Amino acid sequence: LGAIGMYRYKFKGKAIIDGLLYIPVVIPEIVLGISLLTIFAKVNIPRGMLTLILAHVTFCIPFVIFNVRARLAGYDSSIEEASMDLGANRLVTFFEVTLPVLAPGILGGALLAFTLSIDDVIISYFVYGQTKTYPLKVMESVKSGVAPDVNALSTLILVGTILFVLLTQGDLFKKKVRQ
């Protein structure tokens, strides 16, 4: 929804919000991690799962918004108007017309955000508290030898990723053959 709002509407402060979206993308992760840690300390939020989630959302949301906004760039909004002319209300139009068109951008952004999040060590290190994330566990185990559970989880993630890529590429191939 943020991407739709930023793409379609003009409002006061839009340029500022757009500029703020680029900050987590362009600043070094260590600076972002220290900044978030400082903010959480100032507002007395104890480090833990909440700070970890807030930090990762802060870090990853721009990638989702940029992906969806790129999808919107080639979107013809006249199909929404046609939907409403045929009797659909705004909510039905959103779920039946807009969302299916934006779904690849949303999915791509979500996968990119997941990949960045699961790979992130630096920000997680600063904000994690008692919660051990997968990358932190891997970094910790490298010092003493990689534990079997880390190897197993890494293998599952790799196999899952390969299967996902093969399935999506197969689906794309089938669509091209049909055309």
Predicted features along the sequence, with ranges:
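Membrane-interfacial helix termini and adjacent extracytoplasmic/periplasmic loops
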Residues: 13-15, 30-59, 91, 128-129
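Transmembrane alpha-helices
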Residues: 27, 64-69, 75-77, 88-119
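Transmembrane-helix boundary motif in ABC transporter permease subunits
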Residues: 1-21, 38, 167-176
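Residue-level signature of the transmembrane alpha-helical core
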Residues: 16-23, 50-57, 98, 106, ...
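Generic alpha-helical transmembrane segments of integral inner-membrane proteins
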Residues: 1, 27, 106, 110, ...
